[in-house]
Amino acid sequence: QGVITPGINISNPNLPWFRLTNYGKKVIQEERFLPHDPTNYIQSFKQIISKPDPIVIAYLEESLRCFTAGCLMASTMMLGIASEITFLNLCAAMLNGLKDASERAKFQKIIDSISMVAKFKFVRDKIEEVMKNAKQALPDNTIIVLLSVFDLVRTERNDVGHPQGNLPNLTRDQVFVYMRMFPQYCLTVQEVESYLKTNKV
């Protein structure tokens, strides 16, 4: 998986000697959500996300399996789907949390459309409105986390999910970062959903 490589020096270049790669050094510095350890990754994910969507978990587990097998495009595709499902769940929570009937009708039409960008724009604008009117309602980085992860994964998923002349040049480092960011994305979504359950917007 690119974490270790045979040999420790010029005199001992082969097995049974081995050393950490630069990528491996990066991996061992992290304490949680290591995609190289799918079991603990999922356990840690379930510890911070209350009642995780079983469909999200299924795609996340598949993404982890693909990652450990070195199938980076497939891993990114599965993670992108998990990200999209998470966002659609947020859209449903947002719809239920809207207090204005005309705004609910407007957002329902957007939800029924195929445009993910339109959905995200509505949700983003509404969250910005909430944060402007209630300073402590949500964490300061809510928009940044949602925007960065959603846009990143959506773009990569589109790149790997549609036939094209040139294959996407995904690196293990890139996908590693995506996997590390995903739990925080889901945690941020959970915080927004929790707010919407008790506050009409």
Residue ranges and their predicted role:
Residues 2:
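Glycine-centered, phosphate/nucleic-acid-interacting loop/turn motifs that mediate DNA/RNA or nucleotide
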Residues 12-73, 180-181, 195-201:
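Charged alpha-helical initiation segments
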Residues 60-92:
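Short, hydrophobic, well-ordered secondary-structure elements
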